[in-house]
Each structure stands twice: as C-alpha cells, then as structure tokens.
C-alpha cells in the first residue's frame, strides 16, 4: 500500500488548486444497509492489484454495469476511482450517480481534504476512509465529508483500528478481509472483528473483500449487515444475475 499512497499524494498535489463545486448527495448508504438480512454493495472495479485486469471498461460500460447491479438488487454501488493501480476514474462516480437511484460510494485512498471536496463535486453519496491509510486523521476527514453532505464508510482491518470508533462517528463501518500489508484474504477477519465493532457502534457493518459466492454471504451474515463485492461480480458474465444470487443468499440470513 505504501507505493499506492505515494502516487496518491502526487495526485493530491495535482488537484490541490482546482475549484470543486459540491453537488447535493442525499442518498443514504447507512439507511440502505439497515434492512433485514445481508445487503449487497456491488463494486465497479476494472483492475485488482492482486488479480490483475478484470474487465475493460469505459464510461458507457461503467454505467451499464451499475444499472445491471441495481437491477439485481444491489443496495448501493461502490465505484473504485484510483487510476494507476485499479484503472478507475473519479468521473465514474458522476457517471454511476446519473445511471442509478441507489447510493453511490466513492472508493479510493482518500487522505486529504481536497479529495473529499472532489468526491462531493462528482456527486458521491458516501466516501471510503481507510484507517490504515489515514490513522488519527480519520475524524477530521469524516467531519469534512459530513459537512459536504456525504456519509462515510470507515474501513478497518486490524484490532488497533477499533480505537478510532470511540473518536469519530462513521455512518458505516467496514472490515476489510484483505490484510493490506500482505494482500492475503481471510474471511475470519470479519467474523472476529465484527462483534467488537458491534459493541462499539450502531453503524451497519460491511464485510469487504473475499466474497466469491452466495455461500460466503451466508457465512459473513453471522455478523455483517452487508457485503461489498467487486472481483467476483466484475468477472460474472451476467452481473445482474450474480448480484441477485448474492442478494437471495443475504435474505436467507434473516
């Protein structure tokens, strides 16, 4: 992740002097994930650093895939916008927002206030803040996102991150099953950290990474309120049907 963050810092300086005009958000990801069973956040992710190129996309493809996810029953759409390692684009947030009616999450390595402003400019309803990337700066970025009318999914991936939950007020909490230091995936990370998160906050809990089918949704549903799924869906020949099967599995946990 160090290499990714180094490039992110360079891009931050490239956009620092730009003027961003916030767009009204208003679609609540927290509310969308608060229903019974396990909800599905479906992700548009052209490339994975661990899996390679998943699918060639342009703006039209991104919009159509987002619509397919929504038809399948996705509660929200995650848009990976990091350009160098994931082949995303910040503009894809706006593309997806105009294509669907469900909440849109901007997923990137947000480490600076200007990126929060950029997210609001493109119409994100929520932004991802990664504890491993920002540490004690998380509360400031979360407050700024709220000031711009956006919700925040705070991502943790280790025990020491639990302390942040007493220092800030995220709308949603995610547990990344991928260790960002080794890139290894272990679904037990959610099963172990999840109950501790539930003791500290009423925010919906999202299991991120590693979902490879409906059976994983059922397993993670022991503690999670939602799953965020990217690679599995990007490889699916019928993304709408793939989401539908995950949603059905989530409903079976009610």
Curated annotation (Swiss-Prot):
Q: Which EC number(s) are documented for this chain?
A: 4.1.1.48
Annotated Pfam families: IGPS (PF00218)
HAMAP family documented for this protein: IGPS_A (MF_00134_A)
Coiled coil (residue ranges): none
Protein name, entry field = Indole-3-glycerol phosphate synthase
| Reaction equations catalysed | 1-(2-carboxyphenylamino)-1-deoxy-D-ribulose 5-phosphate + H(+) = (1S,2R)-1-C-(indol-3-yl)glycerol 3-phosphate + CO2 + H2O
Q: Which domain of life is it from?
A: Archaea
**Family from the record:** Belongs to the TrpC family.
Q: Indicate whether RNA-binding appears among the record's keywords.
A: no
Q: Name one GO molecular function term.
A: indole-3-glycerol-phosphate synthase activity
Q: In which pathway does it act?
A: Amino-acid biosynthesis; L-tryptophan biosynthesis; L-tryptophan from chorismate: step 4/5
Xref: InterPro entries:
Aldolase_TIM, Indole-3-glycerol_P_synth, Indole-3-glycerol_P_synth_dom, Indole-3-GlycerolPSynthase_CS, RibuloseP-bd_barrel
Q: Does the keyword Amino-acid biosynthesis feature in the UniProt annotation? A: yes
Q: Which UniProt keywords apply?
A: Amino-acid biosynthesis, Aromatic amino acid biosynthesis, Decarboxylase, Lyase, Tryptophan biosynthesis
**PANTHER family named in the record:** INDOLE-3-GLYCEROL-PHOSPHATE SYNTHASE (PTHR22854:SF2), TRYPTOPHAN BIOSYNTHESIS PROTEIN (PTHR22854)
Q: Which gene encodes it?
A: trpC
Q: What's any GO biological process attached to this entry?
A: L-tryptophan biosynthetic process
